[in-house]
Amino acid sequence: MNIIFWGTPIFCVPILEKLLKSNHNVLAVITQPDRRRGRGNKVLPSPIKQKALEENLPIYTPVNITKEKDIQAKIKQYNADIFVVVAFGQILPKSVLKLPKYGCWNIHASLLPRWRGAAPIQWSILSGDSETGVGLMAMEEGLDTGAVLLEKKLKLKLLENAEQLSQRLKDLSCNLIIEGIEILEKVREQSQSLSKLNLTKQEDINRTYSYARLLMKEDYLINWNDSGYNIHKQILGLYPNCYTYINSKRLKVLESIPINNKYDEFLDFRYKDIILKSQSIINNNGLIIDIIENIGIIVQTKDVPLLITKVKLEGKKESSQNALIQQLTLTNSQNKLGE
């Protein structure tokens, strides 16, 4: 198959690599323009553009593909069999969708129609989903509304953060796209139309529709008056950027465990007394209620106490266990987070 690949973030890179190592031909790459990013706020290419440069592939970077007819004309000249689209970052217009002979196919990191939109991985964790996956969808003009050709599922792990889940979904996606292209090749070989494909309309899938909206700055700030379970999901889902304050310094919270029997296998200490202590504290959420050597600190929340095992204090390196304890107790005379 002759393919044009559309994508932008790091999530896409292994999928492009998989296609490049296959017996298929990647003709060109379309990605978002260079943008300011990183600590130095320098103008940098997208991860996909970096990979395409390494492979000497033709690259196009439309600001708005709908309006840029010159780029559309250049793409048309490739006469591609299919477009593979993974987190490109723009909605493709009908004039682009109709170009490839065997369709535009989007890999989406959720089990559609659940978590259509920009941040499906984060929202699956934030919402406490037990299962997620990836789907290969026939693209249409709507946002993630197309019929599904294939999907692969996985179970979320209790302490799995967004970075770890993303890696597992990348691996699934690499297998998914090769399987999907094999199906499309059979259609081509048999001179059949795409109407012969066994596609499932999303309205026929027995799942609740939900929208994975873009994340905002305020989503990353921990509210210690919230449930400990919700805070834990926030830390996992927004890894590694969830934060609080300690003596007016920003503190990223990287790892946590709710102190509850559901997480018993991860708690290497007796915690019943801590739960009793927590239950006796009223209206003091964010308080560090205990410090356990070689493990971490325990923080009061609305319901269950939360064990914090790894942090990054503003201007410091990541710290865990005793280094975390020393850093926070020296910084925080009031023994409280969120202030």
Curated annotation (Swiss-Prot):
Top class in the EC scheme: transferase
Family: Belongs to the Fmt family.
GO MF entry, a single one: methionyl-tRNA formyltransferase activity
Any single GO CC term annotated in Swiss-Prot or TrEMBL for this entry: cytosol
Residue positions binding (6S)-5,6,7,8-tetrahydrofolate: 110-113
Keywords of this entry: Protein biosynthesis, Transferase
Top-level division of the source organism's lineage: Bacteria
Catalytic activity, EC: 2.1.2.9
Role noted for this protein: Attaches a formyl group to the free amino group of methionyl-tRNA(fMet). The formyl group appears to play a dual role in the initiator identity of N-formylmethionyl-tRNA by promoting its recognition by IF2 and preventing the misappropriation of this tRNA by the elongation apparatus.
Protein name as catalogued: Methionyl-tRNA formyltransferase
Name of encoding gene: fmt
Cross-referenced Pfam families: Formyl_trans_C, Formyl_trans_N
Lineage, uppermost ranks: Bacteria, Bacillati, Cyanobacteriota, Cyanophyceae, Synechococcales
Catalytic activity: L-methionyl-tRNA(fMet) + (6R)-10-formyltetrahydrofolate = N-formyl-L-methionyl-tRNA(fMet) + (6S)-5,6,7,8-tetrahydrofolate + H(+)
